[in-house]
Amino acid sequence: MFTRVANFCRKVLSREESEAEQAVARPHMTIIPREQHAISRKDISENALKVLYRLNKAGYEAYLVGGGVRDLLLGKKPKDFDVTTNATPDQVRKLFRNCRLVGRRFRLAHVMFGPEIIEVATFRGHNEGSESDRTTSQRGQNGMLLRDNIFGSIEEDAQRRDFTINSLYYSVADFTVRDYVGGMQDLQEGVIRLIGNPETRYREDPVRMLRAVRFAAKLNMRISPETAEPIPRLATLLNDIPPARLFEESLKLLQAGNGFETYQQLREYHLFQPLFPTITRYFTENGDSAMERIIAQVLKNTDNRIRNEMRVNPAFLFAAMFWYPLLEMAQKIAQESGLAYYDAFALAMNDVLDEACRSLAIPKRLTTLTRDIWQLQLRMSRRQGKRAWKLMEHPKFRAAFDLLELRAQVENNTELQRLAQWWAEFQASAPPEQKGMLNELDDDPAPRRRRSRPRKRAPRREGTV
């Protein structure tokens, strides 16, 4: 009896504390009329509008929410549009034949229009500790949300979102924007602010720490002090995140057009180590090693390519970032084992990529390309005869040449610079000129294979067959 009373008291007290926290975090709801914001329906995907209109017509609340609203208010073009509603996932599926339900941790409806997917989420609610809540919401021992399918009201949903600037709701019914957490003011002031208690929210989902840094770099905003303070202390929580999810997050961080700024902030908040432990071991106090210079340069180059709408390949990014740890590993294996350098290099590739894949589940299709780029580095100086032409026929030659140029740039190595310049001229030359360049090479001729002489047989003794 005493235990039941104690549990009841704890439940009431925790609920009162939770409600008190919410009251502090939630300002009075602000409705921003059409004439006071920049969102226009012409800038919204037609398919997103179809979803909103059909949900409204069926009697459900429905709003555009998240990054789409944020970007529209900032005058940017959103990459995608998310919808939130009081309709359950099953109710959404009944309204749309082109819908499928996804996710176990967060149950979502994906309404598919060809290549475009409109994500529809039901308003999230708070866990009140009831038996039914325990079956639809689960936490790990470290506070991480393992499952969260408790539905609630729009007010609760606003509190459950991560950052205030992502908790703005656009209504297609009256063209207003609803703000429950002061997100509009933070957006105008350029502040990334977590909703609720930062440490609790980071423990629920440690990836929020990466998102804070990503949004700060992407939107050129600052992270509020209370949102930033716990990050270095809690950075190791990322070790509990599945490597496949961290791989996807790493691409969003480093290959979205703001990679260099994001990289600097990841280092500042101690978030780089859980993603790239191999690389972090080689960081220097001044940040001026060849490895750190090549990482900075490859990220700047990647940002420029994305701004110019050019293709980027994660395999090249990883090849550049892990190049100097690979060299050190190969040298160490060669010295300790007595293997030829080429064999030690092959073993080092395995070791470096195996460790990288333990924190980031880099797909095999990318690690294979990364290996190709690395192996070609050893062949770039061997240009005699037909080797140069054969090398240029390799599918990853261009990427390997780009890495060679990067190495020459960051190492300030005269020999590497001459080699990179030679390859640049060779690629741009006509076949007769290429032949002349090969003839002029001062390099030593390629070593010829020695013919193995037949062994001399011992003279036969008399009487033997």
UniProtKB/Swiss-Prot annotation:
GO term, biological process aspect, one: polyadenylation-dependent RNA catabolic process
GO molecular function: ATP binding; poly(A) RNA polymerase activity; RNA binding
Family recorded in the similarity comment: Belongs to the tRNA nucleotidyltransferase/poly(A) polymerase family.
EC number(s) stated in the UniProt entry for this protein: 2.7.7.19
Residue ranges of the TM segments: none
Catalytic activity: RNA(n) + ATP = RNA(n)-3'-adenine ribonucleotide + diphosphate
Ranges for region Disordered: 430-465
Domain of life of the source: Bacteria
Biological function: Adds poly(A) tail to the 3' end of many RNAs, which usually targets these RNAs for decay. Plays a significant role in the global control of gene expression, through influencing the rate of transcript degradation, and in the general RNA quality control.
Compositional bias (Basic residues): 448-459
Keywords for this protein: ATP-binding, mRNA processing, Nucleotide-binding, RNA-binding, Transcription, Transferase
Entry protein name: Poly(A) polymerase I
PANTHER family in UniProt: POLYNUCLEOTIDE ADENYLYLTRANSFERASE FAMILY PROTEIN
Residues annotated as the enzyme's active site: 80, 82, 162
